[in-house]
């Protein structure tokens, strides 16, 4: 059982390590949608135009929300 867990972790690690850096930029809407400051006030029906990125905004994106949030917009 322990060998199986180690094998699974190794497969996940190798998959992440071999991923190209540019894949994050090519997948524009991967992640959780968020509300940018330009989206207007909190009203039902407003679209969420930003995307939350865990490790900050990738190149070509900019931070679109004031504060410590990582809500980014292309």
Swiss-Prot record:
Leader sequence residues: 1-19
Superkingdom of origin organism: Eukaryota
GO cellular component, one term: nematocyst
Gene3D superfamilies named among the record's database cross-references: Anthopleurin-A
One of the record's GO molecular function terms: toxin activity
Propeptide residue range(s): 20-28
Statement: the UniProt record of this protein carries the keyword Calcium: no
Keywords: Cleavage on pair of basic residues, Disulfide bond, Ion channel impairing toxin, Nematocyst, Neurotoxin, Secreted, Signal, Toxin, Voltage-gated sodium channel impairing toxin
Principal location class: secreted
Compartments it resides in: Secreted; Nematocyst
InterPro entries per record: Myo_ane_neurotoxin_sf
Signal as UniProt keyword: yes
Disulfide bond positions: 34-71, 36-64, 57-72
Family, per entry: Belongs to the sea anemone sodium channel inhibitory toxin family. Type I subfamily.
Name listed for the protein in its UniProt record: Delta-stichotoxin-Sgt2a
Organism: Stichodactyla gigantea (Giant carpet anemone)
């Amino acid at each position: 059982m322990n060998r199986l867990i180690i094998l699974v972790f190794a497969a996940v690690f190798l998959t992440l390590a071999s991923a190209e850096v540019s894949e994050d930029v090519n997948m524009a809407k991967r992640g959780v949608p968020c509300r940018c400051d330009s989206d207007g006030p909190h009203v039902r029906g407003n679209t969420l135009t930003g995307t939350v990125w865990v490790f900050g905004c990738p190149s070509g994106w900019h931070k679109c929300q004031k504060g410590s949030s990582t809500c980014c917009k292309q």
